[in-house]
Amino acid sequence: MLCAIPHFGISQTKKTGIRFFSGGWKEVLIEAKRENKAIFFDAYASWCGPCKAMDSLVYTDPKAAAYFNKRYICFRIDMEKGEGPDLAKKYPSIDGYPSLLFFGSDGHLIKTILGSRTVAVLIAEAKYALLN
């Protein structure tokens, strides 16, 4: 007898990149609380050029991976598919792509950034978010 068990976990952007959680938003919140880690949320769209640049240039960077994988549960979602539209309604600060949101481990929104960032600037923003 086969049993289907849902798999939630971490997916990785290439081998050296930031690990993104592969479950849904509710599971991200549970995991963040369980691990006592903040949440980094990348709200993107499949047609977005700056989003694609972040994916290929920033999220694959070893420095970004080392910083984010240690301190954050990272989550990314296409805001035009699946639970994306509902999350866009829940978080009105998502008003363009990419929108980069930082949450505390308890799920409260700390900060939203609109637009792509370099590795150094994204890490600086992430450090600042952890101070608040």
Can you say where each PLM-predicted feature lies in the sequence?
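Bacterial Sec-dependent N-terminal signal peptides
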Residues: 1-13
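A detector for short, charged/polar N-terminal pre-domain segments
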Residues: 13-19
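A short beta-strand-turn-helix
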Residues: 20-38
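Thioredoxin-like thiol-disulfide oxidoreductase module
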Residues: 27-29, 33, 60-131
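Short pre-active-site segment immediately N-terminal to redox-active cysteine/selenocysteine motifs
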Residues: 36-39, 43-47, 96
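Conserved redox-active cysteine motifs that mediate thiol-disulfide chemistry
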Residues: 43-59
